């Protein structure tokens, strides 16, 4: 919780297959939960975003264009979503997932591709298809009211992120070079 808000963030390209329609539906479904807010950061210019949404208004969603510094967004988020459509786009890695974990932010990610190598169900987050909108919304609502689980997920997220640290990678490369 940040300022009594459970902030759900998604960072992605302005592409339908990245799950933007699903994100909007989930936010709409949770609109009556005043303590939950949504943040969508798109890797696009503002004019492209304006054209895509054509002046739609969202009660509980803040939409941002391309950002140079994401730290301020991560540091004020409670949960990060990756809603890539499992039948249209398979994440091979998922940099935003690892970044979220490094900030100690739990994640909800697709149950295929790279994310399943990063996230263990129930430890750092949850593996749920973006097409399971009700299930994602229910999990968000549950987490927003369960501080203990969020604290445990956050601790596990930070620990998992260490596996992807630059120092660890450099150490492994040095071992190979020196072998």
Regions found by a protein language model. Name each.
Residues 120-122, 126-133, 141-147, 162:
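Conserved acidic donor-binding segment of nucleotide-sugar-dependent glycosyltransferases
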Residues 75-90, 105:
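Acidic donor-binding loop of glycosyltransferase active sites
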Residues 6, 15-29, 134:
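A conserved mid-protein helix/loop that constitutes part of the nucleotide-sugar donor-binding site
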Residues 11-17, 37-50:
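Glycosyltransferase donor-sugar binding loop
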Residues 135, 142, 149-163, 172-175:
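A short, well-ordered alpha-helix in the C-terminal region of glycosyltransferases
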Residues 49-68, 79:
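Nucleotide-activated donor-binding/catalytic signature segment of Leloir-type glycosyltransferases, i.e.
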Residues 75-77, 96-106, 110-111, 121, ...:
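Conserved donor-binding/catalytic loop of nucleotide-activated donor transferases
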Residues 92-97, 115:
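Short glycine/serine-rich donor-binding loops of glycosyltransferases
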């Amino acid at each position: 919780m940040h300022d009594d808000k459970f902030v759900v963030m998604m960072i992605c390209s302005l592409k339908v297959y990245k799950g933007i329609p699903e994100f909007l539906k989930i936010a709409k479904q949770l609109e009556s939960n005043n303590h939950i807010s949504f943040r969508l950061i798109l890797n696009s210019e503002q004019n492209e975003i304006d054209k895509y949404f054509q002046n739609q208004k969202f009660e509980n969603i803040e939409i941002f264009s391309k950002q140079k510094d994401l730290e301020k967004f991560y540091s004020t988020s409670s949960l990060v979503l990756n809603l890539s459509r499992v039948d249209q786009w398979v994440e091979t890695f998922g940099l935003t997932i690892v970044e979220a974990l490094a900030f100690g932010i739990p994640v909800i990610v697709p149950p295929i591709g790279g994310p399943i190598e990063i996230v263990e169900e129930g430890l750092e987050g949850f593996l749920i298809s973006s097409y399971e909108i009700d299930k994602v919304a229910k999990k968000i609502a549950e987490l927003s009211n369960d501080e203990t689980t969020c604290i445990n997920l956050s601790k596990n997220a930070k620990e998992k992120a260490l596996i992807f640290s630059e120092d660890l990678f450099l150490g492994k490369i040095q071992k190979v070079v020196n072998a």
